[in-house]
Amino acid sequence: MRAVETIVRFSRLEPRLRLLATEAVLNLARARLAIRLLPFRRAIDFGAIPLGEGRGEDVGAIVRSVEAAAWRLPWRSVCLDQGLALQRALRRRGQDARLHYGLTAPGSGPLSAHAWVVLDGEVLLGGERAGSHCSVAIFPAD
C-alpha cells in the first residue's frame, strides 16, 4: 500500500518538484553504490563535482527532495548517502556546498561518524547530529 501511495503522491507533484524528486532518487542510488563499491576517496568525489552554472533554484526544495526520497527508498540511506546526493545536486547548480565528515569527540562515548552538508555557513542536512561530532575533513578540500 505504501508504494501505491508514494506513486500517487509523486504523480500529483508539479513537474519541477517531480524532476527534483527523480534527481534525488538517482543521486541517492548512485551515492550508495559509490560508497559500497569504491574506495572512500573515490566515493567521496561523487558529490564534490565542479560547480555548474547557477540557476537560482530553491535550495530548500532541493534539500527537502533528498530528505523525502531518502525516507521512501527501499534501502536505508545513511547520512553519507544523503550528504553526497545533496552536495552533488547543489554543486551542479552552482552552489558551493561542502560535505563535512566528522567523528565523535574523544572521551564523549563510543566512536561514531557523521556527515553533514554546509552552504554559506549554514548546515542544510545532518545538522541534528553535527554538534556532537568534530569535523575531520571537508570535501571538496580548498
For each predicted feature, which ranges?
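Short, well-structured beta-strand/strand-turn elements
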Residues: 93-107
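N-terminal amphipathic alpha-helical segments
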Residues: 139-140
